[in-house]
Amino acid sequence: MLILVSPAKTLDFEQPPLTQVYSQPDFLYHSQELIQVCRQLAPSDIATLMKVSDKIAGLNAARFEGWQPQFTLENAKQAIFAFRGDVYTGFDADTLSSQELERAQSQLRILSGLYGLLRPLDLILPYRLEMGTALNNARGKNLYDFWGDILTLAVNKTLTEQGDRIVVNLASNEYFKAIKVRQLDGQLITPVFKDYKNGQYKVISFFAKRARGMMARYIIKQQINSIDELIKFDAAGYYYSEEHSTQSEPTFLREAQ
């Protein structure tokens, strides 16, 4: 079972990592090509392209300029400890055991605009380059064109190695669009999380993001390897609703908080 998640805008490079174990990203050659494109952008270009403030644009211009592909624990950090958004709050990597981190290294992949596809312990430098960015490059008009089939082929390779060929998509639509579903060599499961509000069950972004992280954690900690086990997920008051589900979109409901 392979889990796909999105990265986070919020980063933490201040706290030291909880393990000295690390790996290197698989697609640094491609990342370098993107960095060269980004270095041609003035801070004002970055502000417009990424729809960010001048301050954040200046910070990212400096990050692009200082980026270099020799990653060590002195200048970089493992992705799973560097990302600090709602998904990662739900996943709570800081409290996983070394064995569970090892399992996550095998089963969890983080889609990234700059790095393509990251394992949890892959080292990264701080960056901001969202997958939906319309960055013109030698391969096309955006990052979906840039990554092309690369990420889908990488996912298929991992599915072959794992054997069960189940992909659990816990990523946002923006990031999952980088995967070519028709080329996926496995069964795609996209869990949906809905909270009760104003008389109906609906997807509430903040809660759904955190629930995605909690489900990823559940899969790792409980060593889930089947859909029958997956739908037993019940963290934080969520429960599986067969009535609201389809075969590819198991839906989990939660009453008003």
Curated annotation (Swiss-Prot):
Q: Which domain of life is it from?
A: Bacteria
- Spell out the disulfide connections: none
Which Pfam families does the entry link to? H2O2_YaaD
Q: Which InterPro entries match?
A: YaaA
Q: Which Gene Ontology BP terms does the record give?
A: response to hydroperoxide
Q: What's in the GO CC field? A: cytosol
Family statement drawn from the similarity comment of this UniProt entry: Belongs to the UPF0246 family.
Task: Identify the NCBIfam families for this entry.
Answer: PRK02101.1-1, PRK02101.1-3
> What's the protein here called?
UPF0246 protein Sputw3181_3112
Organism lineage reads as: Bacteria, Pseudomonadati, Pseudomonadota, Gammaproteobacteria, Alteromonadales
